[in-house]
């Protein structure tokens, strides 16, 4: 099943450069896989939305939210 997403022109052109002969889905899966490995900043920097410091701050905030959510999850 395919989905339509809206992205900024600059992000689109970065994805086009990254994808080569691969599909957009393949590129995004790769980037998401890197995120799952603990490299959220790689995804943010790749799309040019954050510098490395901002990405690290966001990663820390996400970890804090995750801990908070886990504290509310019933066992």
From Swiss-Prot:
Keyword tRNA processing in the entry? The reply is: no
Record key words, sorted: Toxin-antitoxin system
TM stretches of this protein? none
* Domain of life per record: Archaea
Q: Which InterPro entries match?
A: Put_antitoxin
Pfam families in the record, alphabetically? VAPB_antitox (PF02697)
Asked whether the keyword Signal is assigned, the reply is no
Please describe what this protein does.
Possibly the antitoxin component of a type II toxin-antitoxin (TA) system.
Instruction: Kindly give the NCBIfam families that the UniProt entry links to this protein.
Output: PRK13696.1-2 (NF010250)
UniProt lists the family membership as follows: Belongs to the UPF0330 family.
Q: What's the protein name?
A: Putative antitoxin PH1062.1
Recorded source organism is: Pyrococcus horikoshii (strain ATCC 700860 / DSM 12428 / JCM 9974 / NBRC 100139 / OT-3)
């Amino acid at each position: 099943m395919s989905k339509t997403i809206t992205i900024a022109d600059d992000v689109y052109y970065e994805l086009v450069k990254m994808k080569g002969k691969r599909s957009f889905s393949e590129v995004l899966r790769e980037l998401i896989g890197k995120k799952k490995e603990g490299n959220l900043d790689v995804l943010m920097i790749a799309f040019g939305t954050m510098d490395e410091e901002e990405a690290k701050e966001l990663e820390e905030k996400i970890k804090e939210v995750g801990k908070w959510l886990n504290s509310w999850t019933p066992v």
